[in-house]
Amino acid sequence: MKFQSTLLLAAAAGSALAVPHGSGHKKRASVFEWFGSNESGAEFGTNIPGVWGTDYIFPDPSTISTLIGKGMNFFRVQFMMERLLPDSMTGSYDEEYLANLTTVVKAVTDGGAHALIDPHNYGRYNGEIISSTSDFQTFWQNLAGQYKDNDLVMFDTNNEYYDMDQDLVLNLNQAAINGIRAAGASQYIFVEGNSWTGAWTWVDVNDNMKNLTDPEDKIVYEMHQYLDSDGSGTSETCVSGTIGKERITDATQWLKDNKKVGFIGEYAGGSNDVCRSAVSGMLEYMANNTDVWKGASWWAAGPWWGDYIFSLEPPDGTAYTGMLDILETYL
């Protein structure tokens, strides 16, 4: 999400009225390669390293299983770099944190779904912009080495770079690619852009990202798109029923023009008629352009969301009860 503060308290965003299922949405044949949800919790809180169960939480394998049972085959799993690597980006792991992260990843992949590992750090470590491409490459070489033998694991270079030098964003993404490949990992790599990797600003801000290279040719351009007035994902109010499609149209053309493939790694809208139309319209537009769009993941599931406006956590998350029928159309 655009504003980091939204992650500091699990249920700070308020609540929304649920819209019941059965609104006439006809299930179409599955067209996306990957479709699912973010799994949030391990990146919560401001206490570093913090205490598991007090300051942060790991996703619940049983609710992941529930979502897999609904047909989801993709989960973007958040973690915080400072908790995994408390001393330095190139230092030793906190073994308990790594084990818990791996448990979540295994819960996803044992269920036959794909796990996208997401360092949810906004291009920063200990509050400072990551400026060493060498250290970032080492970070990724080490982490990819942990998961290189699991074909269902994929790697997200970092969540939502923002207010950074554009060449640095490009170079950090390339360093991540280089590190992952140096580890012997051959899975897909999801790269993110500057300005919170927004689809609606991608063409103006992140055009240089087309210059990334990968010997495996498995780069996926991950963009995020919220549908409220400022695109921050902090309001349950969507601009209009067509805003979803409108905000990704230019990015779609950019992907086509540059022969790239993309993925909407975060999106959401409130459980109301306007947002339901906006989300449905965006997904339908993507479904009609699967030559460039590989899929999407909702923001977000996770055990500590409470009555958060976009919670997809079973059994009673606001979006689980009010938006899941829209998503099920594409499962």
UniProtKB/Swiss-Prot annotation:
Signal peptide as annotated in the record: 1-18
Database matches in SUPFAM superfamilies: (Trans)glycosidases
Keywords for the protein's UniProt record, in alphabetical order: Carbohydrate metabolism, Cellulose degradation, Glycoprotein, Glycosidase, Hydrolase, Polysaccharide degradation, Secreted, Signal
UniProt key word Chaperone: no
pH dependence, entry free text: Optimum pH is 6.0.
Active site: E160, E266
GO biological process: cellulose catabolic process
Top class in the EC scheme: hydrolase
GO molecular function, one term: cellulase activity
InterPro entries reported in the protein's UniProt record: Glyco_hydro_5, Glycoside_hydrolase_SF
Primary site of residence: secreted
Pfam family, one: Cellulase
Entry's induction text: Expression is under the control of the xylanolytic transcriptional activator xlnR.
Record's subcellular location: Secreted
Reactions it catalyzes: Endohydrolysis of (1->4)-beta-D-glucosidic linkages in cellulose, lichenin and cereal beta-D-glucans
Keyword Metal-binding: no
Sugar attachment sites: N38, N100, N211, N288
EC assignment: 3.2.1.4
Thermal dependence of catalysis: Optimum temperature is 70 degrees Celsius.
Family the UniProt entry places it in: Belongs to the glycosyl hydrolase 5 (cellulase A) family.
Biological role stated in the UniProt entry: Has endoglucanase activity on substrates containing beta-1,4 glycosidic bonds, like in carboxymethylcellulose (CMC), hydroxyethylcellulose (HEC) and beta-glucan. Involved in the degradation of complex natural cellulosic substrates.
Name of the protein described by the UniProt record: Endo-beta-1,4-glucanase B
UniProt source species: Aspergillus niger
Higher taxonomy: Eukaryota, Fungi, Dikarya, Ascomycota, Pezizomycotina
Gene: eglB
